[in-house]
């Protein structure tokens, strides 16, 4: 047995029993179950003693902390990705993958993430906020159409719509408010769409997304077979490195750790615009972080093993 395989075997033993947390109570429950199933299969293929856990309550987390040595969080959306689960696991002293409570809560909040990025001088599209205390006022609306309307606290593009006219704006806001009381109306950026994964402090190769939809929506992410993923992304090496450095700044500003993904646009003048950050990216067969990892010869199972290993002291 080689030294490398000995080290892997030792690491697997040190991991102990791993709970893969999936499902949850958010609108992204089905996606989470798919991510969790893939993660569980990968961990088992690497010899890890892992069990899938469909969690929907704090009581379940308390029970899990008594039975397992660490957790792989494959929960997407509210509670699982917004700091709720992370806070409980912190209180139970159970190590887990991904960002801590504060960074998770911030990253899940698109509005406050944008305020933070703007405050530290990072580029993000202009926006306005609609909430119960700030109703939409078409008389003072000063963004240029088109715009994109999105719930502040949802993922997977749930509740999002592109709007081309003032007449259609209220309908899009009403639709988004089915998912969240706080709505973001953001300036539409015409250009190319990219995503950049971050793994253990390093930016992975960027991916350019091409879709025949208006934007990279839920269907384009999880169901469409026409979405194109370009990796290499088509940028010059120096340009990609420049944007990767920006991505790391955005990731660090939020206080994220272990892994994540930053989505951005590159406009017609090659100006990058930060859109959002995901601290528990999808891990399905359509997902982007595994695709970027593959570009640096990191298989899905090795990626998952690396992530859970980041919970070791």
Curated annotation (Swiss-Prot):
A GO biological process of this protein is: cell wall organization
Catalyzed reactions per annotation: 2 D-alanine + ATP = D-alanyl-D-alanine + ADP + phosphate + H(+)
Task: Tell me yes or no: is Manganese among this UniProt entry's keywords.
Answer: yes
Q: Which InterPro entries match?
A: ATP-grasp (IPR011761), ATP_grasp_subdomain_1 (IPR013815), D-Ala_lig_Van_CS (IPR000291), D_ala_D_ala (IPR005905), Dala_Dala_lig_C (IPR011095), Dala_Dala_lig_N (IPR011127), PreATP-grasp_dom_sf (IPR016185)
* This protein's GO CC annotations: cytosol
Task: Please state which protein family the record places this protein in.
Answer: Belongs to the D-alanine--D-alanine ligase family.
Q: What is this protein called?
A: D-alanine--D-alanine ligase
- Give the source lineage, highest ranks first: Bacteria, Pseudomonadati, Pseudomonadota, Gammaproteobacteria, Thiotrichales
> Which gene does this sequence derive from?
ddl
């Amino acid at each position: 047995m080689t030294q490398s395989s000995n080290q892997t075997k030792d690491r697997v033993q040190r991991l102990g029993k791993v709970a893969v947390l999936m499902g949850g109570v958010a609108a992204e429950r089905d996606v989470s179950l798919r991510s969790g199933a893939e993660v569980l299969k990968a961990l088992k293929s690497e010899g890890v003693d892992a069990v899938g856990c469909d969690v929907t309550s704090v009581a379940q987390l308390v029970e899990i902390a008594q039975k397992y040595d660490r957790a792989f969080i494959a929960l997407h959306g509210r509670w699982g990705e917004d700091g709720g689960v992370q806070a409980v696991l912190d209180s139970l002293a159970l190590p887990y993958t991904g960002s801590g409570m504060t960074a998770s809560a911030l990253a899940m909040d698109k509005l406050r993430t944008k305020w933070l990025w703007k405050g530290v001088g990072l580029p993000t599209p202009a926006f306005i906020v609609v909430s119960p205390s700030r109703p939409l006022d078409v008389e003072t609306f000063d963004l240029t159409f088109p715009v994109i309307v999105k719930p502040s606290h949802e993922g997977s593009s749930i509740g999002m719509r592109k709007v081309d006219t003032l007449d259609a704006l209220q309908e899009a806001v009403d639709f988004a408010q089915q998912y969240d009381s706080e709505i973001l109306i953001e300036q539409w950026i015409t250009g190319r769409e990219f995503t950049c994964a971050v793994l253990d402090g390093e930016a992975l190769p960027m991916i350019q997304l091409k879709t025949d939809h208006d934007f990279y929506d839920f269907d384009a992410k999880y169901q469409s077979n026409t979405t194109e993923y370009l990796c290499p992304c088509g940028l010059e090496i120096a340009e990609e490195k420049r944007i990767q450095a920006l991505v790391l700044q955005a990731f660090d500003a939020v206080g994220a750790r272990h892994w994540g993904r930053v989505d951005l646009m590159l406009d017609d003048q090659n100006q990058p615009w930060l859109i959002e950050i995901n601290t528990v990216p999808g891990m399905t067969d359509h997902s982007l972080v595994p695709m970027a990892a593959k570009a640096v010869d990191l298989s899905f199972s090795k990626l998952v093993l690396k992530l859970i290993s980041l919970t070791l002291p």
